[in-house]
Design a protein with these regions (language model features):
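A short, surface-exposed beta-strand/turn
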Residues: 49-75
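Exposed beta-strand-loop-beta-strand "reactive/processing" segments of non-cytosolic proteins
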Residues: 26-59
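Detector for Asparagine
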Residues: 2, 31-33, 68
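Short, non-transmembrane alpha-helical segments in secretory-pathway proteins
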Residues: 1-28
């Protein structure tokens, strides 16, 4: 399975689990146990937009893109990204 297939398979389960749409997927990496995926999710909308609060999540996926575990790595303001 390639990175694009992992993203397509994992995204519906991630959306269901978080009850939110990820803003972006910042990384997908293969490892010996499967895959690790990082994504940013809007936690709190603000004005101006640069003050939006995002959570960065890490998902540990098996070889078939099923979620084994996840955690919040950090919270960031949109203006701090990049």
């Amino acid at each position: 399975m390639n990175v694009l297939e992992i993203q397509r398979k994992a995204l519906p389960e991630i959306k269901e689990m978080l009850r939110k749409e990820p803003e972006s997927i910042s990384s997908i990496e293969k490892n010996e146990n499967g895959w690790t995926l990082h994504c940013e999710v809007l936690e709190k909308k603000a004005i101006p937009e640069t003050y939006d609060l995002l959570k960065v999540y890490e998902f540990i996926l098996d070889h078939d893109a099923k979620i084994n575990s996840f955690k919040v790595l950090r919270k960031i303001r949109r203006g701090d990204v990049g």
